[in-house]
Amino acid sequence: MYKNYKISAPYFEFGPKAYLWGDELLRLAKVIDEAAIEYDVDVIITPQYTDIPLLAKHMKRVHVYAQHVDALVPGRGLGSVLPEAVKYAGAVGTMLNHAECKIDLETIEATIKRCDEVGLATIVCADTLEELEAIAKMGPNLIVAEPTALIGTGTPSSMDYVVSTIEAVKAINPEIMVLQGAGISKPEDVYNVIMAGASATGSTSGIIKAEDPCAMARGMLKALRDAWDERHK
């Protein structure tokens, strides 16, 4: 775990994947950044590697993360993603082990260690309870509990999954904040998962495929704030 990194609950992750880039991504990111300031929530955005400097230059409340890095050190490794390079580009962290970019547990652990050395926060995705427990023992900054089968479906995780995965991580390392992902398609989903005990949630298709992505993003961040405040009355 990179100890010099700070992010506060509740937080939100928007992953544009390969749907958005350049100016179109920047326009949406600016709206998200403004909403993050308005609702006093932290937001992670994981742009294409080439857009890291663009977003890092313009964001105030948004944390810019890489979509992935490799565990290599400077030297040979054509086609690989060097942790030092994404940090130099302006990223403060990286996602690892997303369902669309899976790596094995040994590689996850090695990459977390490299990121700790370089000074990058890590948000690591996990599908099953067993995978989640194994990753929690490696000490990432953040964990995404996300059933692979539900990604992009519009169907959120069951409340049993939400509660059990949060409890499992907290039993291993209470410092790790758990983001509940997969199937978050509307503000109501955001509200429900935060009320169930999550520190965070996120969305890709729910925002990108919305009739008005900017309005959907704002609505989700408002729901995040409302649920957190309701939970902590």
Predicted features and spans:
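Conserved N-terminal beta1-alpha1 strand-loop-helix module at the mouth
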Residues: 1-81, 122, 130-140, 208-209
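Catalytic cores of alpha/beta
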Residues: 126-139, 184-201
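C-terminal helical cap(s) of enzyme catalytic domains, especially alpha/beta-barrels
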Residues: 111-117, 157-160, 207-233
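Glycine/small-residue-rich loop that forms an oxyanion/phosphate-binding "nest" at active or ligand-binding sites
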Residues: 60-115
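Generic structural signal for well-ordered alpha-helices
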Residues: 29, 33, 52-53, 83, ...
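Conserved anion-binding
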Residues: 95-168, 172-173
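Glycine-enriched alpha-helix->loop->beta-strand junction motifs that scaffold or abut catalytic
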Residues: 58-64, 87-94, 117, 138-144, ...
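Glycine-rich phosphate-binding active-site loops on the catalytic face of alpha/beta enzymes
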Residues: 17, 92-103, 142-155, 196-217
